[in-house]
């Protein structure tokens, strides 16, 4: 049995633990601060996203532990190591602005997951690779759906 000792994979996964923690806070902010048309539909959708990405974060952290890593576990570590940025909502935003922000973060995660897929494929870490492929597929679908909500094509 091959042992996964890649520092690169461990660093990548830890970076995603940080990203996913910051992202779940952003989803919660959208959930709390959304107003206007489509409120009921999108408010419920944010509940679903919050759960999904919370589960992703847990799976990534547990995979990191399984390969001998140590996931970040403090707010300070999350903020210092995430490429997903905090986004304080200090003034009201339209539903479209909130969804554009959400799509931007989803696209960042999608692109980083693609890098992780390539890294883990090169290293022969099939378990992590499969996990990232599944997560990326879900993100691709969310991007398509939210862009459709915004009246845009998926690759626009």
From Swiss-Prot:
Reaction equation(s) it catalyzes: 2 Fe(2+) + H2O2 + 2 H(+) = 2 Fe(3+) + 2 H2O
Disulfide bonds: none
Residues binding Fe cation 1, per UniProt: 31, 58, 62
Compartment list: Cytoplasm
Gene Ontology process terms (BP): intracellular iron ion homeostasis
Enzyme class, broadest EC rank: oxidoreductase
Keyword terms: Cytoplasm, Iron, Iron storage, Metal-binding, Oxidoreductase, Virulence
Record's GO cellular component terms: cytoplasm
Coiled coil feature spans: none
UniProt-listed Pfam families: Ferritin (PF00210)
Principal location: cytoplasm
PROSITE patterns: DPS_1, DPS_2
This protein's record includes keyword Iron: yes
Induction: By iron limitation and stationary growth phase.
Binding site for Fe cation 2: 62
GO molecular-function term, one example from the UniProt record: ferric iron binding
Similarity annotation: Belongs to the Dps family.
Free-text function comment from the UniProt entry: Protects DNA from oxidative damage by sequestering intracellular Fe(2+) ion and storing it in the form of Fe(3+) oxyhydroxide mineral. One hydrogen peroxide oxidizes two Fe(2+) ions, which prevents hydroxyl radical production by the Fenton reaction. Does not bind to DNA. Dps is important for full resistance to heat and cold shocks and is essential for full virulence of this bacterium. It seems to play a direct or indirect role on the production and/or stability of listeriolysin O.
UniProt domain comment: 12 di-nuclear ferroxidase centers are located at the interfaces between subunits related by 2-fold symmetry axes.
Protein's name in the database: DNA protection during starvation protein
Source organism of this protein record: Listeria monocytogenes serovar 1/2a (strain ATCC BAA-679 / EGD-e)
Encoding gene (name): dps
């Amino acid at each position: 049995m091959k042992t996964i000792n890649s520092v690169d994979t461990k660093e990548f996964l830890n970076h995603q633990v940080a990203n996913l923690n910051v992202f779940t806070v952003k989803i919660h902010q959208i959930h709390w601060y959304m107003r206007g048309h489509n409120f009921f539909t999108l408010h419920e959708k944010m509940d679903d996203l919050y759960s999904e990405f919370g589960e992703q974060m847990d799976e990534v952290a547990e995979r990191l532990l399984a390969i001998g890593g140590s996931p970040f576990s403090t707010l300070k570590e999350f903020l210092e190591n995430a490429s997903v940025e905090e986004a304080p909502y200090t003034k009201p935003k339209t539903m479209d602005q909130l969804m554009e922000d959400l799509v931007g973060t989803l696209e960042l995660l999608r692109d980083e997951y693609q890098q992780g897929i390539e890294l883990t494929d090169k290293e022969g870490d099939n378990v992590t690779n499969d996990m990232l492929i599944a997560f990326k597929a879900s993100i691709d679908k969310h991007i398509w759906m939210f862009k459709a909500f915004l009246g845009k094509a998926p690759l626009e």
